[in-house]
Amino acid sequence: SDVYLTLNFDLQRAAEEGLKKSKTGRGAAVALDPRTGAVLALASAPAYDPNIFVGYSDEDNPKQSKKINEYNLAVQGIYPPASTFKIITAAAALEDGHLDVKRKINCPGHYNSGPRVFKCWSTHGPVDFFDGVSNSCDVYFYVVASETGAAAIERVERKFMFGRQTGIDLPGEKAGNLY
């Protein structure tokens, strides 16, 4: 079968350089074309350099192979979706008729759910949908998610392919975890 490379050189370089300059030296960056799913950039740090093995065997240098990061964070890491999931929550609420984009929800900087308190990154005061998205207001989306319900959100997240492998055909790709 044929393999077509869709990487954008400038985006790929920017992703790799950005990861090199990060304080932790660890992370992943992926840029996709939303229309086609083509991978425009895919980087993981620390990077894996197979050239380090040239001329060595494990018997020659057993410590060397343990130092190499053979884990591609971009395709093998499993992460909480964080703010990217707010749009999924909004889509589920719109689909089920639970979202009035003009309705204002007050953000006091936290959301109480039973005995648990979830914090927002700021105190936004009254926000509508557009403010909730542009300010990434956690409280707004906690309220919308609570009103929409887990079943509706799960239906939409599956439509958006959450919990599945992408099919990128790279070794070790992991499916997301919905729970």
Question: Which residue stretches match the model-derived regions?
Answer:
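Conserved, well-ordered alpha-helix/loop/beta-strand core segments that scaffold catalytic motifs
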Residues: 1-27
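Beta-lactam-recognizing serine transpeptidase/beta-lactamase-like catalytic domain environment
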Residues: 7, 33-83, 88-179
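Short beta-strand scaffold segments in enzyme catalytic cores
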Residues: 29-31
